[in-house]
């Protein structure tokens, strides 16, 4: 499978995830723990890689991130 980049990044939501996480005063470890409670297997370093754009984000991860961060998926994708 070929891996594609968009403007040098593997996702378009990392900046928004970082913004929302900081607004809620969560650490990357806190966010990873909340995702794990929701059934998503993810570690702190993966959250970091998502935020800097070096890791893809699956649709089910995006859905849970939007719930945890109390924002819409559209906002995370930059279309709202």
Model-predicted segments: where are they?
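Short alpha-helical DNA-recognition segment
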Residues: 25-49
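DNA major-groove recognition helix of helix-turn-helix
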Residues: 35, 46, 51, 61, ...
């Amino acid at each position: 499978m070929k891996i594609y980049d968009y403007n040098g990044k593997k996702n378009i939501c990392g900046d928004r995830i970082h913004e929302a996480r900081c607004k809620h005063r969560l650490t990357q470890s806190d966010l990873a723990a909340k995702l794990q409670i929701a059934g998503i297997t993810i570690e702190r370093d993966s959250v970091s890689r998502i935020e800097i754009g070096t890791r893809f984000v699956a649709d089910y991860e995006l859905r849970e991130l939007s719930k945890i961060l109390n924002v819409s998926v559209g906002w995370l994708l930059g279309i709202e």
